[in-house]
Design a protein with these regions (language model features):
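Short loop->beta transition adjacent to catalytic acidic/histidine clusters or analogous donor-positioning motifs
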Residues: 1-2, 26-27, 158
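Active-site nucleotide-sugar/metal-binding loop of Leloir-type enzymes
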Residues: 13-28
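TPR/TPR-like alpha-solenoid signature
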Residues: 147, 186, 190-193
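Flexible helix-coil transition and linker loops at the boundaries of alpha-helical arrays
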Residues: 136-139, 170-185, 194
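Catalytic-site signature of metal-activated, phosphate-bearing donor transferases
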Residues: 16-19, 38-164
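Specific register positions within alpha-helical solenoid repeats of the TPR/Sel1-like families, i.e.
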Residues: 154, 193-194
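The conserved acidic donor/metal-binding loop of glycosyltransferases
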Residues: 26-38
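Short, acidic/glycine-rich phosphate-metal binding loop used to engage nucleotide
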Residues: 3-11
């Protein structure tokens, strides 16, 4: 076990430092958080889907659960990747990016791989707002982070800032994902009625 302190804290820096600690002979990196659990059989399902030339796996992720224990928000995630050719980017809500010089990546869909997130509702998420502000400062045209910052301002009841950021999100030419655009519009409506 290696213990390190990442200061100032950024999720991408911490994940990239962790990647540096992965043994050189590793082929595949599986990134999970301490509050996430794979369903039994995930490794066999991953190995069946991963073929020569694969560099990243797409698999099912349950982000939260309803009060009755049924699945809440579910989507596909891509945090399993080849040992080389990837780096994490963004201070928060970090994502994998293919590095230059490694050629195009090739994804596989890993049917049967299921990761469940069991968030601790008592855990503070207070660090997210300043990290999202930093993310948008670093990359002002990243539609995903602009949306997340508008949403975070909404959570903090900072209505005017939320409205400005969500409108900015909707105006970005890269903001084409219908689900996220819809979320921005719903939050805008709530901002106006707050």
């Amino acid at each position: 076990v290696v213990e390190e302190r990442v200061e100032p804290w950024r999720f991408d820096t911490a994940r990239n430092r962790s990647l540096e600690l992965v043994p050189e002979d590793a082929d595949i990196c599986v990134c999970t958080d301490l509050d996430e659990v794979f369903h039994p059989g995930w490794r066999a399902a991953l190995e069946a889907a991963w073929t020569d030339g694969t560099t990243q796996a797409v698999y099912r992720y349950t982000w939260n659960f309803n009060a009755d224990g049924s699945e809440g928000t579910v989507f596909w995630i891509e945090k399993i990747h080849a040992r080389r050719g990837y780096r994490w980017t963004h201070p928060v809500h970090e994502v994998l990016e293919r590095q230059e010089g490694w050629g195009p990546g090739r994804k596989c869909t890993a049917e049967g791989v299921q990761l469940d997130h069991h968030a601790d509702p008592a855990k503070s998420r207070g660090q997210y707002l300043p990290l999202l502000e930093l993310a948008v400062e670093e990359d002002p045209n990243n539609d995903r982070n602009v949306h997340y910052l508008g949403r975070e301002y909404f959570f903090y009841r900072r209505w005017e800032e939320s409205i400005a950021m969500l409108k900015r999100h909707l105006a970005l030419p890269t903001a084409t994902w219908a689900d996220e655009r819809c979320a921005s519009m719903r939050l805008l409506a709530k901002d106006y009625f707050a």
